[in-house]
Amino acid sequence: MPQSSKNILVTGGAGYIGSHIVEQLIKNKENVIILDNLVTGYKKLINKKAKFVKADIKNKSKIIEIIKDYNISSIIHLAAYLNVSEAENNKKKYYQNNIIGTKNLLEVCKNSNVENIIFSSSCSIYGDVKGSINENRKANPQGYYAYTKYKSEELIKKFSKKNKFKYGILRYFNVAGASPSGKIGEIEKSHGHLIKNLAIESLKKNPKIKIFGNDYSTKDGTCIRDYVHVSDLADVHIKGLKYLKDNQKSFVLNCGYGKGYSVKQIVDIFKKIKKSVDVQYQKRRPGDIAQVYANTKKFKKILKWRPKFNNIKLIIQSAIKWEKKLKN
């Protein structure tokens, strides 16, 4: 990889979402460096056409070395812990990794050639809200994971005012599904992602699914979420980076389809695709909110983006297909 070329660093590039972003960057003939400590990333998700560096964003000296040696001009920053329940019980771990890790990255950018950064944020920073959410809504993080994303956003905005680079903050809604290529998908099982769990259960003789809370202030009592296909989300990062390069204007955008599905609705769709599933209702999880879905007007206007996979049945089917491949 020539040092004179402008290269893109993807932190967390061996993870679920990161690997899909890397896949599309490589498809676009970009020079990509993946930084991942493989704590929540996986070797099998590392794209062989990218340069992989096993490192931790908490290791500031290593980040300096990577950005200098590979002449990084743009960063897509995904490296973070993201288990909502774990965050409530281990705040120090999440503070050090998600907040201090982001701070390290920003401080290293001061004396570098980095021009743009895309940050992986979360719709959870809005807190417990009703209906469609636009980007102007005041942040009100309810759980500690959401708080780490909010604080990281604030660090990026503050740093950008004092330095030359531009930023794109992407507030993800619920990411699901797997790449149409069939080469990558979600491996981690511990995050409690509904569609991932259903895909796992689809391969069992007697599938079971836990629903955390059926007493929320929603139509059927279960949480409502805006599910977005991971390959569509990856495409948003590509278009977001292009926008920063072409327009030199920072942005904050919601990343969803603008349509909410309840947990029960997702389970019912799964039943139609596959088979019956034993539903087991549990207590609410700490940090979970009742309903959240995106207002996508600004999102589509700025990036001129149109989804390719915005079909919930297709999303679930792609997750099941990936799960079958993992098992085999």
Describe the residue ranges of each PLM region.
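Short, solvent-exposed loop/helix junctions and linker helices
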Residues: 11, 96-99, 188, 192, ...
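Short-chain dehydrogenase/reductase
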Residues: 95, 142-150, 184-196, 226-227
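Basic phosphate/pyrophosphate-binding loop/patch that engages nucleotide-derived ligands
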Residues: 110, 158-162, 191-195, 199-202
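C-terminal substrate-binding subdomain of Rossmann-fold SDR/epimerase-dehydratase oxidoreductases
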Residues: 197-328
